[in-house]
């Protein structure tokens, strides 16, 4: 028997392997983590070549995590089209997501020439720490969902500090390690606020009419997910089991989901509550930006994602 000779991994092979990833068609440069990273470089002044490498690490990891999220949430849509695992299968999608994680990780060695901080010699540990945080947060989220345990708002905020915050802290920690600026500002209170703000905004949007085209109608109910406004509604009246019963049944029909949405909007005012928390977080974030000396690009991002009012819902 003739053993195969060792050959280089070819471009056609790579293209096939990455199909579930490229299928999503996500422009990572326009995703919020990348936008925030570029804006924070106003303070860190990392050279453009190093910034580009950081974005090549963070962008793919972000998209790979979405591939896994869609499987774990049993989602139907992502960006308005069928999720990758319904097209390519669960096994291939998991394999692709894992491959993308490791492929992105390999870029970390390209940052070594730009290292400025003598205290940091292992950039890989930055990625390790935040990927661990992401999985810890996701683990809590899945545990609550599958055990039908409603967390408190405080517990939920701690969870998203890990799960969502990781994708914002990771690139900022890399910027910090590579920054030539001698007296660096402490940007991490602001980074953490942005992570929490982004998740609560997403939670509120997922119940809105605007989100239906991208992810389907009120998919958090179908996924049995304890989002920020859903948690508020459950805790607002623990004697009413409506939402817990609906989350347990994971409904697909719009009538049941509209019933839950009307209850949250009219009875517990949970959408208004989430909106007020968002406004409060926006105010705190803007104050932090001013403390750090201002940042026009970051301020522009806040204007872009700002909610002027509670998003319109479709509860009729």
Swiss-Prot record:
The keyword Magnesium applies. Keywords: Lyase, Magnesium, Metal-binding. It catalyses: (2E)-geranyl diphosphate + H2O = linalool + diphosphate; (2E,6E)-farnesyl diphosphate + H2O = (6E)-nerolidol + diphosphate. The gene is ILTPS2. IDS-like terpene synthases originate from a geranylgeranyl diphosphate synthase (GGDPS) progenitor in fungi, after the split of Melampsora from other genera within the class of pucciniomycetes. They lack coupling activity and act as classical terpene synthases. Pfam families: polyprenyl_synt. It is an enzyme of class 4 (lyase). Terpene synthase that shows monoterpene synthase activity and produces linalool, using geranyl diphosphate (GPP) as substrate. Also shows sesquiterpene synthase activity as it is able to convert farnesyl diphosphate (FPP) into (E)-nerolidol. Mg(2+) 2 binds at residues 69, 73. This is IDS-like terpene synthase 2. Coiled coil: none annotated. Belongs to the FPP/GGPP synthase family. Gene3D superfamilies: Farnesyl Diphosphate Synthase. Its EC number is 4.2.3.-. The keyword Lipid metabolism does not apply. GO terms for biological process: isoprenoid biosynthetic process. Binds 2 Mg(2+) ions per subunit. Its cofactor is Mg(2+). Mg(2+) 1 binds at residues 69, 73. PANTHER family: GERANYLGERANYL PYROPHOSPHATE SYNTHASE (PTHR12001:SF44). One of its GO terms (molecular function) is lyase activity. The lineage of its organism: Eukaryota, Fungi, Dikarya, Basidiomycota, Pucciniomycotina.
């Amino acid at each position: 028997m003739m053993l195969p000779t060792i050959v280089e991994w070819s471009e056609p092979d790579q293209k096939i392997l990455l199909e579930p990833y490229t299928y999503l068609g996500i422009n990572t440069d326009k995703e919020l983590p990348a936008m925030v990273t570029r804006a924070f470089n106003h303070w860190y002044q990392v050279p453009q070549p190093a910034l580009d490498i950081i974005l090549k690490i963070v962008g793919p990891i972000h998209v790979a995590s979405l591939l896994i999220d869609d499987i774990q949430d049993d989602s139907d849509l992502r960006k308005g089209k069928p999720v990758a695992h319904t097209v390519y299968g669960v096994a291939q999608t998991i394999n692709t997501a894992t491959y993308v994680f490791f492929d992105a990780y390999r870029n970390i060695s390209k940052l070594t020439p730009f290292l400025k901080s003598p205290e940091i010699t292992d950039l890989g540990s930055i990625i390790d720490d935040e990927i661990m945080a992401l999985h810890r947060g996701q683990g809590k989220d899945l545990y609550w969902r599958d055990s039908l345990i409603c967390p408190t708002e405080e517990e939920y905020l701690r969870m998203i500090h890990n799960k969502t915050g990781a994708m914002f802290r990771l690139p900022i920690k890399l910027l910090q390690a590579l920054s030539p600026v001698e007296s660096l500002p402490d940007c991490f209170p602001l980074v953490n606020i942005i992570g929490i703000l982004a998740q609560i905004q997403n939670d509120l949007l997922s119940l809105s009419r605007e989100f239906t085209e991208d992810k389907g109608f009120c998919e958090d109910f179908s996924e049995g997910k304890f989002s920020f406004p859903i948690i508020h509604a459950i805790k607002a009246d623990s004697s009413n089991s409506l939402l817990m019963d609906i989350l347990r049944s994971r409904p697909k029909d719009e009538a049941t989901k509209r019933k839950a949405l009307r209850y949250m909007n009219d009875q517990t005012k949970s959408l208004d509550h989430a909106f007020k928390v968002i406004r409060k977080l926006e105010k705190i974030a803007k104050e932090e930006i001013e403390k750090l000396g201002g940042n026009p690009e970051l301020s522009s991002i806040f204007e872009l994602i700002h909610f002027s009012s509670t998003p319109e819902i479709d509860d009729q």
